Amino acid sequence: QAWVKWAWLEELGSGLIVLSGADQGALGAALLAGDEARAETLAARLAGLFPQRFYIELQRAGLPSHEAHVRAAVPLAARLGLPVVATHPVQFLEADDYDAHEARVCIAEGETLANPRRIKRFTPEQHFKTAAQMAELFADVPSAIANTVAIARRCSLTLVLGKPQLPDFPTPIMADGKPQPMDAFFRELS
């Protein structure tokens, strides 16, 4: 599981838009464990670090934890005056790709599809959804869809296909006053 130090968020979080991680994040785990006090503390801390940029994330992809999380997260967001956002944990392109995805998962885990005790972490619903499908999934929480659209607009960018667009990554300055070439720098690091 990924993690980030609070100090990093405090130091480097300027301009970030932060989602809570749905049922898989620390806030979601607290809600699913019934620890509303911890969930409220986490949400308040994140909202303080990221004013107008922290969203409680909701997902509905057919896992039991998703609906339990939504039932706990929406009231928490309302109590704290925080926005919710709808996202979808996509694992494959189309619904018909589910069986192939499960076969790949079994290969990676050394399992067989026929094993009735195999832990199933994915559902057939984890394909790309259309805007209409997402709106239907969250018809009872329309603000979650509206916030998804608002975040997408805030994050708009233009990519040129076939041309890598890498972040500016400063390298150490060499004796001649020029930055060290990236390939040489990364070769030293490896």
Predicted regions and their residues:
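Phosphodiester-processing cores and adjacent nucleic acid-binding clamps
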Residues: 1-190
